[in-house]
Amino acid sequence: MGTMKVGVIAAEMEGRATGVGRYLEGLLEGLELWEHGIEWHLFFQGDPPLSLDFQGGPIHAHYSRHHGSRVLWEQVLITRELEAVEPDVVFGPAYTLPFGLRAPSVVTIHDISFEVLPEEFGLRERWRRRILARRAARVAQRVLAVSEHMAGLLRAQFGLAPGRVAVVPHGIDTKQFSP
């Protein structure tokens, strides 16, 4: 068996990192410590993030430089870019997966605030999140939850079988926080 290729939708790391961007940075930094033989292909919508060094090693950055709609890029345009790399699996760390993917996929759904606190979201954003997260949960081979509680909510809200949801708790950034 050759090297496994993982395509990662990494746009949340661009610019000022969001919570999901910081989650992905921490995950990749933690995985760098392992000798795992995985080739990581990170896909960015626009410009490179400043936070990680992508020179050589098992991490390869791909920049689409599409400065239009994030939803259009992450749902449609990225599919062709991902398939050019022929990944063994695609990882969506931010609730969604692109339409038309042929590769197996994994998605992290951090919360379902758009379902349980709908009044906190505008109508358009609430429906965008509902539709895309539900679809991603339906098509992914595995859905990652950040706690047992969230895994239970995902199974109940989206009708997921227990075996399709895995719990991967958030870690801690020991550079910023220490006992």
Regions from the language model: what does each represent?
Residues M1-P179:
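Carbohydrate transferase catalytic cores enriched for Leloir-type hexosyltransferases
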